[in-house]
Structure formats: structure tokens, C-alpha cells
């Protein structure tokens, strides 16, 4: 059995270099179009090493230029169209780490980011925690490192509501009733929606499960409260989009099933399609 670490990277030359920039460039006529992309620090380190070593005739030289360019483009509101969000250096599951370790993972990531994109945008204020692994226990560490928002699987928004229609088919145990402190969305103008035309074994709440919310950690010793914004990552839609994108995910058909609940202009629904590049074999040349 032969295996080449270098070849694994070479097979992903497109997504590691220009594909994200190219996708955003195709939509520059749209006022708000953009994307958030995450690199582990160790992957950045690998790509820098490939460039420094002149691998394959220097094919990795300036691999970071596309991200630099994409980060220089702004939306009509002045936000970067390509946001390289914060991440742990070694792809850590942050809820399993202590506060010092979490902060060091982010600091190391900031360090290699600054080394790689010397003239690029300032470090992102948002984070995609590896594997979307989140716990309120990590909030103080994130906030201490200047992180304002975090992507959270939106099934956890739903599970924290009264009358959540749990099913074992979701792959999760029933929620702790003590955690269900939010009102039933269906009793407040929303609904529990059973999505069709994609794998979605549990109902989703609309609009609640698709709206950013403040989340907080209360220090059990001091009572000090630390808050940040949780951005809902659309669990089932992101999974389907990552599986195959156009053709696999029927965007309009699925989103039309809850768009009628997008009635609060001050707190609009926010459908984030989050996924890992290599899942289901995608993301390679």
C-alpha cells in the first residue's frame, strides 16, 4: 500500500489555492456575496513548506495569493467578501480543552496567519470550531482572544427550546429538560418544520433556529457572565450542500419550506451552509 502525503495535498491544489476566490469573483455583482473559509494552522504550515521546498516545479509558490485577493474585495457594507475565519492551530475539539490551551491554539493560528498573509485583512472576529464542536464553556477563551461570533450547529438552538420534537433518528440523545429555557417557537409565530427533499430526520424551528442569538457562560464561582454571538449553521442543509452542492441540494425547494417565517426584518433568518471540504470525497481536483 503506497501513500504520498505530498500527493494528497497536490490533489487538492484547486481548493487550497484559487477555487474559493474564483467562486466569489463570479458573484462580485451581488452586493453582499461572500464566503467564510477556515484553514488549520497545521495545514497552512504544510502549504508553506511545499512552497518553500519548490515541490512539483514550484506549483505551490504563492498558493496564498488568491485568498489575499479575495480578502481585499468588500461588500457594499464594507465587509470582506472572503473571510478567513479563526480556527484552532491543530484542529482541536475545543470543548475538550482547558481555557489556556484553547487560547494558545488561537494565538498560534493568529501567528501563522500573520506570517502568511502579511498584507492581508486583519484577523477575523469569527470562528469555525473544528467539527462544529461547541460548548458554552469555551466562550470565555474565545472572547478573551477577540472572537465576537462562533458557528454553532443549529440543532442545538432547537434542542434548547420548549416542546422540541426529539427523535432518536437525529443521532442525538433527548435534550436535558433543564437546558430548554427558550420559548416554543411554534407558540411565538414560528413553527417546527419537517424538511423534505434532503436527509432531515428531525424537525427544524423557523425562524428561531436560523437566527443569530447571544449565548453566554456564567462562571460558577464568581457569577461573571461572558457573552458572544452564536451564528446558526444549518445542520441538514449544510450536510446536503457539502455532499454534492448543485444537483444534490435543491436550494430553492428546501428553503422555500421555511421562507414564510422570515418576517422579522430586524432579525432575519440566516441560512449558513457549513461543511468540510473533503467530506463525501469532494474538494479534490
Task: Name every feature range the model reports, one short phrase each.
Residues 1-50, 57-58, 62-70:
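N-terminal regions that are enriched for targeting/export leaders
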Residues 2-15, 49, 88-103, 122-131, ...:
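The substrate-binding groove and active-site-proximal loops of carbohydrate-active enzymes
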Residues 20-24, 106-113, 139, 255:
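Generic structural signal for well-ordered alpha-helices
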Residues 37-41, 86-88, 128-131, 145-146, ...:
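Glycine-rich, histidine-containing beta strand-loop boundary motifs that form or position
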Residues 41-130, 224-244, 268, 272, ...:
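Metal-dependent polysaccharide deacetylase catalytic core of the NodB/CE4 family, i.e.
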Residues 46-52, 96-98, 132-143, 155-156, ...:
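A short acidic (Asp/Glu
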Residues 55-83, 111, 119, 143-215:
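Acidic, His- and aromatic-enriched active-site or binding-groove loops in soluble protein domains
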Residues 196-285:
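Catalytic grooves of carbohydrate-active enzymes
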Amino acid at each position: 500500500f503506497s501513500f504520498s502525503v505530498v500527493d494528497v495535498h497536490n490533489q487538492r491544489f484547486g481548493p487550497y489555492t484559487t477555487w474559493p476566490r474564483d467562486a466569489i469573483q463570479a458573484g462580485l455583482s451581488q452586493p453582499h456575496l461572500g464566503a467564510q473559509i477556515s484553514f488549520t494552522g497545521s495545514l497552512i504550515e504544510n502549504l508553506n513548506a511545499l512552497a518553500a521546498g519548490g515541490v512539483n516545479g514550484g506549483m505551490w509558490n504563492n498558493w496564498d495569493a488568491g485568498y489575499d485577493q479575495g480578502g481585499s474585495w468588500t461588500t457594499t457594507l464594507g465587509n470582506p467578501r472572503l473571510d478567513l475565519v479563526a480556527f484552532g492551530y491543530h484542529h482541536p475539539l475545543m470543548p475538550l480543552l482547558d481555557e489556556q490551551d484553547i487560547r494558545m491554539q488561537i494565538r498560534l493560528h493568529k501567528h501563522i496567519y500573520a506570517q502568511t498573509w502579511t498584507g492581508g485583512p486583519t484577523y477575523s472576529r469569527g470562528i469555525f470550531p473544528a467539527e462544529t464542536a461547541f460548548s458554552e464553556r469555551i466562550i470565555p477563551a474565545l472572547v478573551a482572544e477577540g472572537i465576537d461570533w462562533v458557528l454553532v450547529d443549529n440543532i442545538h438552538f432547537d434542542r434548547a427550546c420548549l416542546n422540541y420534537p426529539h427523535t432518536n433518528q437525529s443521532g442525538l440523545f433527548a435534550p436535558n429538560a433543564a437546558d430548554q429555557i427558550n420559548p416554543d417557537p411554534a407558540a411565538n409565530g414560528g413553527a417546527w418544520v419537517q424538511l423534505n427533499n434532503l436527509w432531515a430526520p428531525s424537525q427544524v424551528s423557523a425562524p428561531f433556529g436560523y437566527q443569530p442569538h447571544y449565548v453566554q457562560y456564567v462562571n460558577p464561582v464568581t457569577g461573571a457572565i461572558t457573552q458572544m454571538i452564536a451564528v446558526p449553521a444549518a445542520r441538514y442543509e449544510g450536510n446536503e450542500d457539502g455532499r454534492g452542492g448543485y444537483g444534490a441540494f435543491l436550494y430553492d425547494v428546501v428553503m422555500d419550506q421555511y421562507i414564510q417565517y422570515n418576517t422579522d426584518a430586524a432579525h432575519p433568518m440566516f441560512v449558513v451552509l457549513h461543511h468540510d471540504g473533503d467530506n463525501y470525497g469532494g474538494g479534490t481536483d
